[in-house]
Amino acid sequence: KWPELETSLIDQDLENIFEKIKTIISLANSARMKAKIKRRWPVTEMAICSILDKETLVQSNNNNNTRKYYDYDHNQFDTELSKNDISEILKNQLNVHSYKVKQIHTSNTVEKVLEMINAHLPVLPLISIIRKNVAPQVKSDIGKVISEFEKIDKVDVLYTLKTDKKFRLFYNKASSFSSSSSSSFIDLYEKDLEISFSVKEGYVYAEKENLMIFMSTNRDQNLITQGLVRDLARNLQQLRKEKSYNPTEILSTAYIADLEKDEVSSLSLHTTDLTYLVRVQSIVLSEEKKEDIEYKIIEIDGREISISIN
């Protein structure tokens, strides 16, 4: 008889968390591809941002009759990822030293960009005038209007749009009867502006549905060395397979040659990790090949390195 599903044993909350984690990992991998950072290479930090539509939340709260959107716990998403030891699992899967979780509530682009700024995410607002919407109102002064708008602090524009639903822009209007000009203004609404954001230098991001990932692309020497350790371990593991060694057998020595002097020094701090990953008793690092050792030449990031194992 086939076993029957015991639904009472299913932890639906835990299932939902892992579904969310799958999406997070997929987005993180997309961000890595943009930055050309391999999955094996550790990165210093990531920010995971969950976007919640206000209307959806209000409808949900009306159905539950429990709380309004502005009472929503901003740390709930972080709590979900922290319980049941999920945090360490996610950190390992993302291959990141640390991550933070943010949650923003938004109903339009203005609020989305503002919320990201207020959440201290690495973004900069991008706002420009939609010429075809504004030109009919200011006619020949469109150039002056655009020029004046470029001088304005874009965060101030966002706050004003959120509170007043419009932004009043003052500019010098050309006179039809003389060379002088007079002060004038135009009220700009969200429909008159193209609003988006860019990611600050040193970061890359990926977005899907209601999730965004911001990943630091800055890699110091320690992170670069850790990435090299992962690459070398993978190639030495492959060499073990090619030589048909028993996967559980602890071999004598792994050799890594054609290294730079500083690489020998930095990798020597990670020999414990390498011996564990490759299952050998010792690691020999050198700038030049050792005599009487048969090496295999591999390529890592466009350069040749020689490895051997026995």
Regions found by a protein language model. Give the residues of each.
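Feature 926 captures the class I aminoacyl-tRNA synthetase adenylation module centered on the KMSKS loop
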Residues: K1-N310
